[in-house]
């Protein structure tokens, strides 16, 4: 079940016309957290209607899904890598310190951006401390989107959480 108050706060940094995530259910399996989400993009925030989900919107949806998954994981103590975090830590680090280090997406069939589903999972989350450098959390993730007409997109992203508590 979606934590509506948490979702509202997670999406607060976004302009009203760029809040695409409508609901999210977070689960944990074998110590790894994942989210299953519903999205709606009534109108693209930057381009005339293309009729399909495009790479910019895929990235925005990924960000919103990932922020909610991390916030919910912190709040509920799910998964690994964020055990020492509080929600206050998350809000402080949400925008400046959660970086997408690598992002790739594959478009298999056009996805209708008006109403579609998505999910993401943490494949691995590790704390790293490079010699002479500041510690950070490294996370490998996978995601996918689909619609009722067999539209399909998937991909992977690597995250770096810097200035970690």
Curated annotation (Swiss-Prot):
Its EC number is 4.3.2.11. InterPro entries: FcoT_ThioEstase, FcoT_ThioEstase_Rv0098-like_sf. GO terms for molecular function: lyase activity. Signal peptide: none annotated. Keywords: Fatty acid metabolism, Lipid metabolism, Lyase. Coiled coil: none annotated. Transmembrane segments: none annotated. It is an enzyme of class 4 (lyase). GO terms for biological process: fatty acid metabolic process. It catalyses: a (3R)-3-[(carboxymethyl)amino]fatty acid + holo-[ACP] + H(+) = a (2E)-enoyl-[ACP] + glycine + H2O; (3R)-3-[(carboxymethyl)amino]butanoate + holo-[ACP] + H(+) = (2E)-butenoyl-[ACP] + glycine + H2O. Belongs to the FcoT family. Involved in the biosynthesis of a unique class of isonitrile lipopeptides (INLPs). Catalyzes a Michael addition of glycine to the beta-position of an alpha,beta-unsaturated fatty acyl-[ACP], producing a (3R)-3-[(carboxymethyl)amino]fatty acid. Acts on the (2E)-butenoyl moiety loaded on the acyl-carrier protein ScoB, forming the product (3R)-3-[(carboxymethyl)amino]butanoate released from ScoB. This is (2E)-enoyl-[ACP] glycyltransferase. It comes from Streptomyces coeruleorubidus.
């Amino acid at each position: 079940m979606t934590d509506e108050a948490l979702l509202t706060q997670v999406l607060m940094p976004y302009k009203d016309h760029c809040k695409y995530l409508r609901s999210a259910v977070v689960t944990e399996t074998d110590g790894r957290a994942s989210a299953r989400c519903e999205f709606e993009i009534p109108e693209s925030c930057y381009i005339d209607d293309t009729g399909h989900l495009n790479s910019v919107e895929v990235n925005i949806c990924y960000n919103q899904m990932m922020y909610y998954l991390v916030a919910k994981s912190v709040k509920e103590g799910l998964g690994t890598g964020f055990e020492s975090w509080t929600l206050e830590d998350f809000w402080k680090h949400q925008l400046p310190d959660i970086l997408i280090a690598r992002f790739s997406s594959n478009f298999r069939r056009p996805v209708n951006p008006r109403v579609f589903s998505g999910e993401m999972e943490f494949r691995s989350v590790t704390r790293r401390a490079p010699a002479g450098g500041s510690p950070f959390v490294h996370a490998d993730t996978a995601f996918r989107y689909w619609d009722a007409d067999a539209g399909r997109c998937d991909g992977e992203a690597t995250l770096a959480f810097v200035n970690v508590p």
